[in-house]
């Protein structure tokens, strides 16, 4: 089966794009200027909202949600009991890593959808073989 052209987008990529002080901002600004179909976890949206709320304020957190609403190329994978079970298994499989549930759910999605490219600054998201856009080979 052919590898799909969609990419997985992690919290760190969303933050890097929206926060000009992030060292990866130029890379993600370029990538988001013409994005392929993107997919993410519902947990990533919760994590991103929380990051902007804690780091900045309610207004920036709402701006983050508005950006997500306007990002028409972004699809969401819900997080239900079945996803919790799969994600928990992966956290245990990589017990030597400090994986959050959001990161582990991202790995589950990457594997299920056979995604080859991951937009993330978090090297954990490459554990199962997806190419990170920050790697030397680049996007």
Residue map of PLM features:
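Acidic, PIN/NYN-like endoribonuclease modules and their adjacent C-terminal/linker elements
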Residues: 1-4, 107, 112-139
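Short, well-structured N-terminal submotif of metal-dependent ribonuclease cores
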Residues: 1-40, 53-66, 136-139
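Active-site neighborhoods of divalent-metal-dependent phosphate/nucleic-acid chemistry enzymes
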Residues: 2-3, 74-118
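A generic structural signal for short hydrophobic patches within well-formed alpha-helices
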Residues: 14-15, 45, 125-126
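Structured helix-beta-strand junction loops
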Residues: 34-35, 71, 97, 128
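Conserved beta-strand segments of alpha/beta enzyme cores
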Residues: 37, 73-75, 131-132
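Short secondary-structure boundary segments
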Residues: 42-43, 103, 122-123
């Amino acid at each position: 089966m052919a590898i799909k052209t969609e990419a997985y987008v992690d919290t760190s990529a969303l933050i890097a794009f929206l926060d000009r002080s992030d060292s990866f901002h130029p890379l993600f600004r370029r990538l988001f200027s013409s994005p392929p179909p993107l997919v993410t976890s519902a947990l990533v949206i919760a994590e991103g909202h929380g990051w902007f709320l804690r780091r900045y304020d309610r207004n920036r957190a709402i701006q983050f949600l508005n950006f997500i609403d306007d990002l028409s190329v972004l699809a969401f994978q819900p997080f239900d009991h079945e996803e919790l079970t799969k994600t928990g298994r992966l956290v245990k499989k990589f017990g030597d890593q400090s994986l959050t549930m959001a990161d582990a759910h991202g790995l589950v999605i990457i594997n299920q959808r056979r995604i080859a490219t991951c937009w993330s600054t978090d090297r954990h998201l490459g554990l199962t073989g997806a190419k990170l856009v920050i790697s030397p080979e680049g996007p």
